[in-house]
């Protein structure tokens, strides 16, 4: 897989961060973007658990990363909120250590379809199913478990919902993507979707193109998919390729904005580096969900959660 196709989720290029500024293990978080002191689910019947799935450093290979604190600021703001008289908890689920079985996928000259074995996305999906079963066995009803995901985590979440909707209350996905910066690199705005995808297939090979198409078609076969999807036309990944989600009955799609503002407010990423707060303007729409401005959509998210957990 070429470097320019690496799906980077929470890489902060401009700074070097202490390990304490990263979230590298599974667990519940609090409003301060730290791991909660209590990692148990007390009174599980009156809790709503949001399982948050990060993006990926690479499409099919393993990584030691998970996410950065600045990336969960908006998710952390939901912790403790009451919906239908039930309290929200947010669980960070780190699965980037998983690897697909056929890593030749992005090596055009070496890969011979079909994909042999289980992809990283499928392994992440299966890991989520195991985690869901764990929480259910502890007493949390299936409908009170919501899957959340960004980028590759969001793409995987849509796959999960299309197959196992009965196991969860719903899905909230932001910038679902996992096949590189197709919108930007293949000039979707200039060429149009069809020609851009032809260029993508020609350059990267049938392996990635076929797998992407297969996964989209599977998701689109859903008769009803009551999920909440956030996209942005300036997202260099799937930004101008996301209209297909509206073909699925039940999908609630939110186009975040047409620029790098939300409701007229400029978006800033606010994080912690070596114990000190920092901020910078959001420059890439793929990461606008990390901006402080994204909390404008908290009422929409809470309304969706309420509709799926009543």
Segments from the language model and where they lie:
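N-terminal cap/lid segment of alpha/beta-hydrolase-fold proteins
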Residues: 21-43
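The feature captures the conserved acid-bearing segment of alpha/beta-hydrolase catalytic domains
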Residues: 178-259
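Primarily recognizes the serine-hydrolase "nucleophile elbow" in alpha/beta-hydrolase
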Residues: 143-190
